[in-house]
Amino acid sequence: MSYYRTFNSYLREIFGERVYRVPLDAGLTCPNRDGTKVFGGCTFCDERGSGAPTIKTALSIKNQLETGIARIRHRFKAHKFLAYFQAFTNTYAPEGILKELYDVGLDHPDVVGLCIGTRPDCLDENILDLLSVYHERTFLFLEVGVQTIHNRTLEAINRGHTAEEFFDAVERAQKRNFRLATHLIFGLPGESEADMMETVRAIAPLKLEALKIHQLCIYKGTPMEADYLAGRLPLLEEDQYVRLVADALELIPEETVIMRLVAEGSRDEIIAPEWCFEKDRIMQKIEAELERRGTKQGSRYAELAVKA
């Protein structure tokens, strides 16, 4: 039994085979890092701007892409790829620069589309106009991070934008029929389980194309590392997180693609929680919890319509 709709199955439906994302660092930054909004960046984010450790930042986008494709092709015998502009904010630059970057991403013959990670406050109409060109030209997936809909938390973690800006950006992008995803983090400082579920209940009715959920991880060198080591930042327990994810999946529309349910990383970059180094085991526990309940993704989505 399939308990939720996976990103792999979604891409297979579109392209007829397994498609792999190649993470890229375009050398950009974020408006909450460079002082446009605030300085310092998100308090959970490391110096790579949430980019994958496999990214070779010293290389050009073309070389990053070629190196990444060669690595993934060798490991998985893959044939099709998405250029994934992952690190930092990939719509935070003049349109001419962004166009050059996206064009390089699409220039490889085995690249079948783009994934672009960004923020809600970096999607003005000019940027959306540019993205519309690529939406018409290729497979375009726009990932708009929000993490939580609670403004007090967004301020506490130094996001530099509000929940209202997120909802506005989603509305404007959906009018252009973009494929949209967002990211949620469970376990942010000061948030209760009720807060996390309130975020899920606010996001679910948007009927985004896809959703990422993961636990708060403490990365080395981040402001959150200092808080955690000082005992000021409790983290979710493993079983608690499993239960919360199962609760969330039940509320999410069954057609929404689930891109991620557990964050993972290496001990070189993450200090806690310990269980984040066992992604496969946690995924199995989430499925086992849904099996125990006799539920799956979307089982309780109708509740949201009734309460609305």
Where do the model's predicted regions map?
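Core AdoMet radical
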Residues: 48-68, 72-95, 110-123, 138-166, ...
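Auxiliary Fe-S-binding modules of radical SAM enzymes
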Residues: 1-20, 210, 218-308
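Short amphipathic alpha-helices and their capping/turn segments at secondary-structure boundaries
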Residues: 68-72, 123-137, 168, 197-207, ...
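Conserved C-terminal portion of the radical SAM core fold
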Residues: 164-223, 239-264
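N-terminal [4Fe-4S]-dependent radical SAM core
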Residues: 1-82
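Structural recognition of alpha->loop->beta junctions
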Residues: 42, 104-111, 198-212, 282-297
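Hydrophobic faces of well-ordered beta-strands that scaffold small-molecule active sites
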Residues: 20-24, 81-83, 114-116, 140-144, ...
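Acidic (Asp/Glu)-rich catalytic clusters
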Residues: 72-74, 102-109, 129-139, 171-175, ...
